[in-house]
From Swiss-Prot:
Flavoprotein found in the keyword field: yes
NCBIfam families per record: glycerol3P_GlpB, PRK05329.1-1, PRK05329.1-2, PRK05329.1-3, PRK05329.1-4
Protein name per Swiss-Prot or TrEMBL: Anaerobic glycerol-3-phosphate dehydrogenase subunit B
EC number: 1.1.5.3
GO BP terms in the entry: glycerol catabolic process
Root EC class: oxidoreductase
Main function: Conversion of glycerol 3-phosphate to dihydroxyacetone. Uses fumarate or nitrate as electron acceptor.
Subunit structure: Composed of a catalytic GlpA/B dimer and of membrane bound GlpC.
Family assignment from sequence similarity: Belongs to the anaerobic G-3-P dehydrogenase subunit B family.
Reactions catalysed according to its record: a quinone + sn-glycerol 3-phosphate = dihydroxyacetone phosphate + a quinol
Pathway assigned in UniProt: Polyol metabolism; glycerol degradation via glycerol kinase pathway; glycerone phosphate from sn-glycerol 3-phosphate (anaerobic route): step 1/1
GO molecular function, one term: glycerol-3-phosphate dehydrogenase (quinone) activity
Length: 431
């Protein structure tokens, strides 16, 4: 099986790169080993929320110089400010064309409400999620937080107690209530099945839609806004938008414990677009080994194609970090298993020195979280000290940064994905 590009990994980085290439007529295949981290995400995308010294970031452009000084191995610094800003704008345009229904701008971060009632700085958020500007107040002063009876992944009272502590909500009267929704009674018999995805699947056929509308109206009372767990609408926001229109209430949804519908919706929309453009998905498959010819990757073999090699002009490593086995740790080393790429080494972290992997304080940023492969400004992967000509890395498999600590995981994913896509398109156009 031969393609122009083979992408290993079907998360936000792999799908963004793949559909961008397919739009330009470059034949792509994505090897998809199952659920991606996107399925467990809040649906919001971070560009850069904090600097390594702990300072809060309001504007990416204004904070870039400080990032470059404090974290010279960060992928943003390797790519360069102008490239990153260009790819950010490119993704914002792409998100609109995909109808991802995101709000926000790279000019300035905003704050989103978390399921525990905190406020977290971010770049883009689903327009159904409650957000506030960095200095602003929430636009409604009377809010009801609605839980679902028997659903333990969303606790409205805990949310209310924490939300009141934020200055942006100090002017609000916040109350709580619960929806019963009789359609869900059979799920309540087994708490393991009473999850957001199961709830959405039961409700999506709208068999008792009017009853649900009436129950929400009654539970909200005279309030102008209500927060609900994100359990309404599996494929997109159309079900939730129908609820808003039918109730006449400003409804907002908050991410729940994983799996998260907000992330699942985005994953499905990206994947649907990729396949609609003619992209090939190797679902339930896993890349196991690779073969090189000179300074190029010649072929890879997968779990379902052990005898028949998968070949391509270019290979893109989008396999993620430890969560998705894009990186593996053993007692003596951390390594990238498919190509055995070089791993980033910093002052605080060495992949072959186990004592450098962790901080003594549990709550501190952990050095191992900055593990990943070495890239250059073109996102080419380094192996044995040399850049591999036709192998690129994108997303969480790249090293030199801690996406959790800095709040930049999604931004790194989409900027590197678009950078690699543009590189390959340019190479194909010149041939």
């Amino acid at each position: 099986m031969n393609f122009d590009v083979v992408i290993i990994g079907a998360g936000i980085a792999g799908l963004t790169c793949g559909l961008t290439l397919q739009e330009k007529g470059v034949r792509c295949a994505i090897i998809n080993n199952g659920q991606a981290a996107l399925d467990f995400s809040s649906g919001s995308m971070d560009l850069l929320s904090r600097l390594p010294n702990g300072s809060t970031v309001d504007s990416f452009a204004q904070s870039y110089a400080a990032l470059a000084q404090q974290s010279p191995n960060h992928p943003y610094v390797i790519l360069g400010k102008d490239v990153v800003l260009d790819k950010i704008q490119q993704f914002e345009t792409l998100a609109k064309s995909l109808n991802l229904s995101l709000v926000g701008s790279s000019d300035k971060n905003h704050k989103r409400v978390t399921a525990l009632g905190g406020l977290r700085g971010t770049w883009l958020s689903p327009n159904s999620v409650p957000t506030v500007s960095l200095e602003g107040k929430f636009p409604h002063d009377n809010i009801v937080l609605l839980g679902i009876e028997g659903y333990h992944d969303f606790q409205p009272q805990l949310l209310a107690d924490n939300l009141k502590q934020n200055p942006q909500f100090a002017h609000c009267e916040i109350t709580t209530n619960f929806l019963h929704i009789p359609e869900l009674d059979h799920l309540r018999q087994n708490s393991r099945e009473f999850r957001s995805v199961n709830i959405a699947q039961v409700l999506e056929y709208k068999l008792s839609f009017n009853n649900l509308v009436d129950e929400i109206k009654q539970a909200v009372g005279n309030a102008k806004a209500a927060f609900l767990p994100a359990c309404f609408g599996l494929d997109d926001q159309s079900f939730f938008e129908s609820l808003k229109q039918a109730t006449g209430i400003e409804l907002y949804e908050l991410p729940t414990l994983p799996p998260s519908l907000l992330g699942i919706r985005q994953h499905r929309q990206l994947r649907h677009r990729f396949e609609k453009l003619g992209g090939v998905m190797f679902n339930g498959d896993r890349a196991l080994r690779s073969e090189f010819e000179g300074n190029k990757v010649a072929r890879i073999f997968t779990q379902l194609h052990l005898e028949n090699a998968v070949t391509a002009k270019y290979f893109v490593l989008a396999s993620g970090g430890f969560f998705s086995n894009g990186l593996v740790s053993e007692f003596e080393e951390i390594y990238e298993p498919l190509f055995r790429s070089d791993i980033v080494k910093t002052e605080r972290f060495n992949a072959t020195d186990r004592f450098s992997w962790i901080s003594k304080r549990f709550a501190d940023p952990q050095p191992y979280q900055s593990a990943g492969v070495v890239i250059n400004a073109e996102c080419q992967v380094q192996k044995d000290g040399n850049n591999v000509e036709n192998l690129f890395a994108i997303g969480a498999v790249i090293g030199g940064y801690n996406g959790i600590e800095l709040g930049c995981g999604s931004g790194v994913a989409v900027t590197t994905a678009l950078k690699v896509a543009d590189n390959i398109i340019a190479k194909e156009s010149s041939n």
